[in-house]
Amino acid sequence: MKTLSKLNLLFAISVILWGCANDDNLQEVLPVNSENTEESLYLENGNEVIIYPNGVAVEKLPDGRIVWGGDIALNEKQLQALTEPDTRAGILRDNSMFWPDGIVYYTLADDVMRSGAYIDIYDAMKHIEERCNISFHKKQSNTKNWIEFVLSEDDVSRSHLGMTGGKQNIWVTSDVNTSTAIHEICHALGMIHEHQRMDRDNYIVVDFNNIRPEWHQWFYRTSIPHNTYGTGLEPLDTKSIMIYGSYGENTAINPDFPYMWRKTDGTTWTNNNVLSEMDILTLNAVYSKPHYTITCKPQCTLSGTVSGSDHYAKGEICALQAFPEDNRG
């Protein structure tokens, strides 16, 4: 577990102000940098936390990867969009980040096979395939974009956000479970965390006072619409596979108390192990089934028999020849 060497670094990352225990007075205050320059803090494990002038905080790993929200590896284009001066905590989204026709190609690294992690990865892919318009196929020699599942070197599972082009990794632990594999694959399909939605404060309370300082950047809100991507599915989904549970032994300062709860009635929720109904609707809204126009050429034969005066019975046999590869449009 990562820890900060100085407690006062808590205030350099974010501060939560409370007013008379009234949720309406809860305010998330991101860092203010009047000099318009980047600032850096270091965790005890040596990882660097970079705070940008707009208040966005990301973690830089020793291998150079930039991580946002705890387990989302950003490419250069996404990092630039995230850290634009006018972007409070957003990220660039466009159609190029989605996998064409919902077809995802993949490979499994040797260490994943040796560790047995591939079993849960296969189970995760099957779970998604059975519920969504998405299919997973092993990489072919001419495949241009694909996912390679590799073992994580720091015991944390992570993924890129959406299709990034070429080979992209999903890092899993040797003891990864199916639900974590589903979660990371969903990041690769373009989904973000439900608890980082721009409107999350309308539905839940995030108690930064009970979140370890080094985890604060995992819970900053985004400034883009949530996972539904315009499907009109408004309520925050506490059953989603993309939301953390209300309690966390490693996340919470006091694990006996929740760090997130529902705003309406104060109830909590647990980690979810499967895609929720809204997760499925969201993925199927983004990855709708492809529609093809197929040209068919009829070939018919006509045969008949005469069975008496003025009576004629005929039978028509037709065969349709379709050429989908040449006539998709």
Label the predicted regions.
Residues Y292-T293, Y312-A319:
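Short coil/turn motif common to extracellular beta-sandwich-like domains
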Residues S14-V15, Y312:
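Processing junctions and N-termini across compartments
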Residues M1-L9:
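Bacterial N-terminal signal peptides that target proteins for export
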Residues T295-D310:
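Short, solvent-exposed loop/edge segments of extracellular or virion-exposed proteins
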Residues I317-G329:
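Surface-exposed interfaces of beta-sheet-rich extracellular modules
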Residues A21-Y292:
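Zinc-dependent metalloendopeptidases
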Residues L17-G19:
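C-terminal motif of bacterial Sec signal peptides marking the signal peptidase cleavage site
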